[in-house]
């Protein structure tokens, strides 16, 4: 039996009919804050408001619903960093199917709990592997041994067709408002979302530039399509943007993206954190890191999109509140507002007061101070964190620190030491 490896607009139209009474038609909103900031019209497709707070329900339900009754009776499995799993268990509950969900050990607790919440007694969650790719290998082995049905999160034409319904829905909404998009920005993890969207847009909105956005620490599609012209596996990835941190994209999504995606943007994880905080404070939108990728990319395209009409897909809103401290920390470091030093501190009374008076600027703030006293020496080691009011103050701060201790270590520039702090 030949396995289908292409996706057509007909496939997406058929998926749209299957999903019509299952998924929520999420809003397409003109965002006034971003429109003013970038001097253009920025629309947001709010998939963070989907039933499982992610677009993944579309692909999961479509892929499961096309299984035969015999296949469904054997149960389903999936590997996911969170959102695809929620789509699968939501579907399993609706169709009363047995499901085993494999998730990386590093998955935020909030996403693990949400999977259990959306599922039922027929759903089992297995935490295994440090990355999605390790987790995937375990899931495939289990699926084969138990003769179940693996629901691929991206490298499956039915999953891709389901994600493509987002594009059909978006174009119908924009047509009713007489809106034509010049640019579309969407996140890339394994490539299912961008493959489905781009397939539909290239047929029904061919003048729209499709921009795929990846975290800089996991740009597997860019490395495969642009750099190597073949699917490659990244040896190491940054797992912070957990919903889009994939070391290897799908063979099917690679071919579709290669044909349809006009350009790729890699966004620093710190910039994503700044976007998350900005969206929350300015727009009251709770976006997860992968969900904020599309908006983060606008800064890279600010000269191109001026005066244009843009749409960003907010792909998910399953953010763990316990991560907010780390998100704020990464944002401050990226914006060059927080700086860490290792200093030799004189072991005598008044040394700290001298440091505060002589080194800190009038608006600087100490956010971390760890002191290791050494009884047999004249100085002790201090790790200190300083937050600035203006990142332009850094040059003068470093000059004053160097005067206080010429042998100091600036931790922000030391990748290994820096990684220990965040």
From Swiss-Prot:
InterPro entries in UniProt: ACT-like_dom_sf, IlvA, Ser/Thr_Dehydratase, Ser/Thr_deHydtase_PyrdxlP-BS, TD_ACT-like, TD_ACT-like_sf, TrpB-like_PALP, TrpB-like_PALP_sf
One biological process term in Gene Ontology: threonine metabolic process
EC number: 4.3.1.19
Residues modified as N6-(pyridoxal phosphate)lysine: 56
Catalytic reaction(s) noted: L-threonine = 2-oxobutanoate + NH4(+)
Domain (ACT-like) ranges: 339-413
Cofactor: pyridoxal 5'-phosphate
PANTHER family, per database record: THREONINE DEHYDRATASE, MITOCHONDRIAL, THREONINE DEHYDRATASE, MITOCHONDRIAL-RELATED
Subunit details: Homotetramer.
Protein family per UniProt: Belongs to the serine/threonine dehydratase family.
Protein name: L-threonine dehydratase biosynthetic IlvA
Originating organism: Staphylococcus aureus (strain bovine RF122 / ET3-1)
Taxon lineage: Bacteria, Bacillati, Bacillota, Bacilli, Bacillales
Name of the coding gene: ilvA
């Amino acid at each position: 039996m030949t396995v289908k490896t292409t996706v057509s607009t007909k496939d997406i139209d058929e998926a749209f009919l299957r999903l019509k009474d299952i998924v929520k038609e999420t809003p397409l909103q003109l965002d006034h804050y971003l429109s003013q900031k970038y001097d253009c019209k920025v629309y947001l497709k709010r998939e963070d408001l989907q039933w499982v707070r992610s677009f993944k329900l579309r692909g999961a339900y479509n892929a499961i619903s096309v299984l035969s009754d015999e296949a469904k009776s054997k149960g389903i499995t999936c590997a996911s960093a969170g959102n695809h799993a929620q789509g699968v268990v939501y579907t399993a509950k609706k169709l009363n199917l047995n499901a085993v969900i494999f998730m990386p050990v590093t998955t935020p607790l909030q996403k693990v709990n949400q999977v259990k919440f959306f599922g039922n007694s027929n759903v089992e969650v297995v935490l295994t592997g440090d990355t999605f790719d390790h987790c995937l290998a375990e899931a495939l082995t289990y699926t084969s041994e138990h003769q179940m049905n693996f629901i691929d999160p991206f490298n499956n034409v039915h999953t891709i067709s389901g994600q493509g319904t987002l594009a059909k829905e978006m174009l119908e909404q924009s047509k009713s408002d007489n809106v034509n998009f010049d640019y579309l920005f969407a996140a890339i993890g394994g490539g299912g979302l961008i493959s489905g969207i781009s397939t539909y847009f290239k047929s029904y909105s061919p003048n729209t530039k499709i921009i795929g956005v990846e975290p800089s620490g996991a740009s597997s599609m860019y490395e495969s399509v642009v750099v190597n012209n073949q699917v490659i596996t990244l040896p190491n990835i940054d797992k912070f943007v957990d919903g889009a941190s994939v070391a290897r994209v799908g063979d099917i999504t690679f071919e579709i993206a290669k044909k349809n995606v006009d350009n790729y943007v890699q966004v620093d994880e710190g910039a994503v954190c700044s976007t998350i905080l900005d969206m929350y404070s300015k727009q009251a939108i709770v976006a997860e890191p992968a969900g904020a990728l599309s908006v983060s990319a606008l800064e890279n395209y600010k000269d191109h999109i001026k005066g244009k009409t843009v749409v960003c897909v907010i792909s998910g809103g399953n953010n763990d509140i316990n991560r907010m401290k780390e998100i704020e920390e990464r944002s401050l470091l990226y914006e060059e507002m927080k700086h860490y030093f290792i200093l030799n501190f004189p072991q005598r009374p008044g040394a700290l007061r001298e440091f505060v008076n002589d080194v800190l600027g009038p608006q600087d703030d100490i956010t971390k101070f760890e002191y290791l006293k050494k009884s047999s020496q004249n100085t002790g080691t201090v790790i200190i964190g300083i937050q600035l009011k203006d990142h332009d103050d850094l040059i003068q701060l470093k000059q004053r620190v160097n005067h206080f201790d010429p042998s100091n270590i600036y931790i922000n520039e030391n990748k290994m030491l820096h990684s220990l702090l965040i």
